Amino acid sequence: MTYSPGNPGYPQAQPAGSYGGVTPSFAHADEGASKLPMYLNIAVAVLGLAAYFASFGPMFTLSTELGGGDGAVSGDTGLPVGVALLAALLAGVALVPKAKSHVTVVAVLGVLGVFLMVSATFNKPSAYSTGWALWVVLAFIVFQAVAAVLALLVETGAITAPAPRPKFDPYGQYGRYGQYGQYGVQPGGYYGQQGAQQAAGLQSPGPQQSPQPPGYGSQYGGYSSSPSQSGSGYTAQPPAQPPAQSGSQQSHQGPSTPPTGFPSFSPPPPVSAGTGSQAGSAPVNYSNPSGGEQSSSPGGAPV
């Protein structure tokens, strides 16, 4: 019988080609310039505003030993706080897109604010004690000056900003899958059938079948090793039938011969007492496999 490509169980042919692995390609995002100067300007602006709001606290406290009541005064700290606020405003303006940067002026104002604040702290009147707000404002102004100076050094190139880490697209495009390679025999048939696209040197010149003994058919249908022209599979050959035997052989090999091949024996006929002439006769030979019996005369010797 013949299997056509439409029948169930027929394997689907796979495309031939070279097998390629998956090659994911990740798209690099634009690194751009370092954002460290922008972060430093933000720090300058925030610290200047924090120093300004902290200056509303008790900077100096009037001592009670002089007979005065407890009171909080600002002393000479107004100027350093004003300078720090100006530096914060200039740094904030530089954050606006396409705005001119005044990083040099901001750095100068930051350092100037630190010097003025230190001078006001140590030159306080003897009747006043230092309040908690003075130390907070001094800390904010010092950190503001440090950030302003770092921004100036990065802007001028004295300090190299760290290179930003390369960013990859999390949804990168993947390469195309290659086709499956050729492994000698093309798919499309049963039991080692060769494909139609196989090289001519590897194809079989004709059907090759193992020799079968004469008179016996193959138990299984033979399969042709050459590809069919339609490419639909193998055609099974019906088993050969054994030749018919002659009538004479069938008559000799009838029911007298069991399946084992040994001759069958039947019991001898009973001898009656009244027949004296046959009492001394020899027994009949029943071992003839051909089934014929030879007659013997009464009293004669067996043949």
UniProtKB/Swiss-Prot annotation:
Give the Pro residues compositional bias ranges.
256-271
Q: How does it sit in the membrane?
A: Multi-pass membrane protein
Q: Where are the annotated segments for Disordered?
A: 194-303
Secretion signal: which residues? none
At which residues is N-acetylthreonine found?
T2
Cellular component aspect of the GO annotation: peptidoglycan-based cell wall; plasma membrane
Q: Compositional bias (Low complexity) at which positions?
A: 194-207, 215-255, 287-303
Q: Where is the composition biased (Polar residues)?
A: 274-286
Q: Which UniProt keywords apply?
A: Acetylation, Cell membrane, Membrane, Transmembrane, Transmembrane helix
Q: Which residues cross the membrane?
A: 42-62, 77-97, 102-122, 134-154
Protein origin, superkingdom: Bacteria
Q: What is its main location?
A: membrane
Question: What InterPro entries does this protein map onto?
Answer: DUF5336
Give the matching Pfam families: DUF5336
Q: Where is the protein localized?
A: Cell membrane
| Family membership noted in the UniProt record | To M.paratuberculosis 34 kDa antigenic protein.
Its protein name is 34 kDa antigenic protein homolog
UniProt organism field: Mycobacterium tuberculosis (strain ATCC 25618 / H37Rv)
